[in-house]
Swiss-Prot record:
Family matches, as HAMAP family: RRF
Keywords associated with the record: Cytoplasm, Protein biosynthesis
Pfam families assigned: RRF
Protein name: Ribosome-recycling factor
Gene: frr
Organism placement in taxonomy: Bacteria, Bacillati, Bacillota, Bacilli, Lactobacillales
PANTHER family: MITOCHONDRIAL RIBOSOME RECYCLING FACTOR PSEUDO 1 (PTHR20982:SF3), RIBOSOME RECYCLING FACTOR (PTHR20982)
Function: Responsible for the release of ribosomes from messenger RNA at the termination of protein biosynthesis. May increase the efficiency of translation by recycling ribosomes from one round of translation to another.
Compartment annotation: Cytoplasm
């Protein structure tokens, strides 16, 4: 029972960290990254469809994304979706592919991105702390139900805290790596 509580908490924390990594991947740092387009949805036959299911996304140069649709008839729809997205990048349509040139970031924009990153980090830490609280509550219920002893409860709480500390350290590490990437010119 005790190991199950820790394992469950650890898995949930890993999911929170994976979500944080995805969110941080969407913050552009002046260089092309295909994950920038992960959230772009294109209306295809009346249904919103992820762009990466309708086109191949390549990086021919360090600051250029190239979107090549599998079906050339939806080129205009893809271009429209890219215009309407919150990317802040103007697509260039040459008739068969769409090129997205990633502009260099200004110092001010870099600072804004670091602030936005801070929000992602904080929400990940809140999620991790909530998972810890849930695990602690489950452990206390197990002790009240006489499934584990009071000593086992203390050991379990210490183990849950260690897992939590490791997850928070990993979130901080991801933050420092991304901040360095954002602030490097």
């Amino acid at each position: 029972m005790a190991n199950e509580i820790v394992t469950t908490a650890q898995e949930r924390m890993k999911h929170s960290l994976a979500s944080l990594q995805r969110d941080l991947g969407h913050l552009r740092a002046g260089r092309a990254n295909a994950s920038l387009l992960d959230r772009v949805q294109v209306v295809y036959y009346g249904a919103p469809t992820p762009l990466n299911q309708l086109a191949s996304i390549t990086i021919p140069e360090a600051r250029v994304l190239m979107v090549t649709p599998f079906d050339k008839s939806i080129l205009k729809d893809i271009e429209k979706s890219l215009y309407e997205s919150d990317l802040g990048i103007t697509p260039a349509n040459d008739g068969s592919v769409i090129r997205l040139v990633i502009p260099m970031l200004t110092e001010e924009r870099r600072r804004e991105l670091v602030k936005e990153m801070g929000k992602y980090i904080e929400s990940a830490k809140v999620a991790i702390r909530n998972i810890r609280r849930d695990a602690m509550d489950t452990a206390k219920k197990s002790e009240k139900a006489k499934e584990i002893t009071e000593d086992d409860l203390k050991d379990l709480e210490n183990e849950i805290q260690k897992v939590t500390d490791d997850a928070v350290k990993e979130a901080d590490r991801l933050a420092s790596v991304k901040e360095k990437e954002l602030l490097d010119i």
